[in-house]
Design a protein with these regions (language model features):
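Loop-helix junctions at membrane interfaces
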Residues: 1-194
Length: 194
């Protein structure tokens, strides 16, 4: 058991180093920038609000694609930059760095679960990453950020946000699975030379 844990941690460390060194390539930078732009576009045009505190969005697809193709470091940078760019394009109140932290954590979680995964590991990584992000980032952290920003009661918002994430989880995981399979099968055509 301990040897499996060591192998998993070594795999994660190597994946982080590999994904960070991949950012030295201009082609990788350009591809990550295009996925970052797609993330920003999807956050505006691929989302809607059920209430002021509950947003449904498809922008997670661009971030998970960045993580699958390029790893946790480019995905974390993309998550952070997406939040900052969104703020400058359409500010809704003062800038709050908590959402940037959420973007970074989302990219790191997707990257840890999806980068360089194939077969059964990918099949487990997709729902695991979405579950971790829904629980830790969407339900806990983002609810905390809303509480700190708006003064809305944390525990009063929690049930509605948890219900939204629970209902959307199977659909989001299925969309991620379909997109990741498409990327896996067509990677050489989509990103020639990478």
């Amino acid at each position: 058991m301990l040897s499996r844990l060591r192998r998993a941690l070594r795999f994660q460390r190597d994946g982080i180093i590999r994904s960070a060194s991949g950012l030295k390539s201009v082609r990788v930078q350009a591809a990550v920038a295009m996925l970052l732009a797609l993330n920003v576009v999807l956050s505006y045009f691929g989302s809607f609000y059920l209430s002021p505190e509950i947003k449904v969005s498809t922008s997670f697809l661009a971030l998970s694609s960045t993580a699958y193709l390029f790893g946790p470091i480019p995905a974390a940078l993309s998550g952070a930059l997406t939040d900052v760019i969104q703020y400058f394009l359409r500010p809704a109140g003062p800038y709050f760095p908590g959402y940037t932290v959420s973007g970074i954590l989302g990219g790191l979680i997707y990257g840890a679960c999806l980068y360089r995964r194939e077969g059964k590991a990918l099949l487990v990584g997709i729902p695991l990453s979405k579950l971790l992000i829904n629980l830790l980032v969407n339900i806990v952290l983002n609810t905390l950020w809303l509480h700190l920003l708006n003064g809305a009661p944390f525990f009063a918002m929690l049930p509605a946000r948890a219900l939204k994430n629970a209902v959307l989880f199977p659909f989001e995981a299925a969309l991620m699975y379909a997109l990741t399979l498409f990327l896996a099968k067509n990677r050489s055509r989509i990103l020639p030379g990478l």
